[in-house]
Amino acid sequence: MLSRICGNGIRLTRTRLQFQPSIVTFRDYSNPAPKRGFLNNLIDNVRDEMQKNKELQEHQQQLKARMQELNESDALKDARKKFEIVEKETLKSSEVVKQKIEELSDHMKKMVHEIQKTEAGKKMTEAGAEALKQARKAAEHVEKVAEKVGDTEVYKHVSTSMKTVKDEIDNIADVRMYSRPEALTKRTDGFDLEKERVVEANDSATDVTLHKDSKWYSGWKNFSESNTYYHKLLDWKIKYDESDNMAVRMMRGVTEKIGSVFSGQNEVSEVLTEIHKIDANFDKQEWLRFCETKIIPNILEAFIRFDLEVLQSWCHERAYTQLSTVVKEYQKMHFSTKDSRIIDINKVEMATGKMMEQGPVLIISFQVYMINVTKNADGKVVEGDPDNPKRINHIWVLCRDVEEYNPALAWKLLEVHMQETPLAL
């Protein structure tokens, strides 16, 4: 209710009316849909499945007809003939591959058995057997590869067979096991692979002065005695390589890269450049492989067998004096090292180099695993242990004879350093 007073004193009153709408509810009453019975649902399901099966059969018949058309086409017939020809040729090739791998496996087994048949090999304890474990594993691996080649898809599917054979061959391509040479080779005898590559002097590219062998060591001696890096190399290189610590092994890859900044890599580059002036086809990795398979085995085996003639062929006067003195002293006392056996040669690396007045000098380091035994005339062990292999770290100084243009004959041992350490198992 609202009110107000007018000017004449009369009060006017107005009342506001409010209406409340009423809520009307409608309810729909209808009959529920009748429920389908079990039998009706079953009939509908059977009808749907029959319809789907009919469509499936139609699609299957269409696919069969299409495959029949493709199978009878001339293009597919020609492709099938070519496939059969390739498959036959691949089977022939796989047989050859399998045969070659089996031959390699037999060769490696014979090498291991040769060591085991020796007197030192028969007396080997668990420590000695462990030293040959890697050799046996390599032989067993090759044998398994041969079996895998026979069982792979070579005999079933050409596309997969060719890849399988390639992968298996790649896996064993880098297997290098030391094989003891039956007959030693002098440096002057040369090697077949290198005799074909005779290099002639390049007078316009090099000004290297030619000198006699007697001047070789005098120049090297002056350098080695005054060079502190060389002395440090002899010390830390041996200690670093002989470490079996996990952290040290992980760091080797890093230090090899960083070391090139602080070590004599610049001098090595200079030496390699000068070598290329004499031998344009010189390759560092090929040369290290030549050292591993030719130079090192012949010198070490000649030292073990007391073959002074072969030693003298490979060594300059200084290195020959070092090695021959030991041999001659042993011969005077009727000592023998014939039961010593080299098991493996590895980690052949180029440590540094130096360009001397007489020519290029390269220093290599490597490790030798061997049974190192010295016996007297009565067959008793006077030095070494036939039951425990040793790891011997080597640092060799090799010089190139610039008067010799045949690379197979040009390299001689100038100086040798050895340090024997027990094999850590």
Curated annotation (Swiss-Prot):
Its main location: mitochondrion. It is found in: Mitochondrion inner membrane. Keywords: Coiled coil, Membrane, Mitochondrion, Mitochondrion inner membrane, Protein transport, Transit peptide, Translocation, Transport. Residues 38-149 form a coiled coil. SUPFAM superfamilies: NTF2-like. One of its GO terms (cellular component) is mitochondrial inner membrane. GO terms for biological process: protein import into mitochondrial matrix. InterPro entries: NTF2-like_dom_sf (IPR032710), Tim44 (IPR017303), Tim44-like (IPR039544), Tim44-like_dom (IPR007379). GO terms for molecular function: protein-folding chaperone binding. It comes from the Eukaryota. Essential component of the PAM complex, a complex required for the translocation of transit peptide-containing proteins from the inner membrane into the mitochondrial matrix in an ATP-dependent manner. Recruits mitochondrial HSP70 to drive protein translocation into the matrix using ATP as an energy source. Probable component of the PAM complex at least composed of a mitochondrial HSP70 protein, GrpE, tin-44, tim-16 and tim-14/dnj-21. The complex interacts with the tim-23 component of the TIM23 complex. Belongs to the Tim44 family. This is Probable mitochondrial import inner membrane translocase subunit tin-44. The lineage of its organism: Eukaryota, Metazoa, Ecdysozoa, Nematoda, Chromadorea.
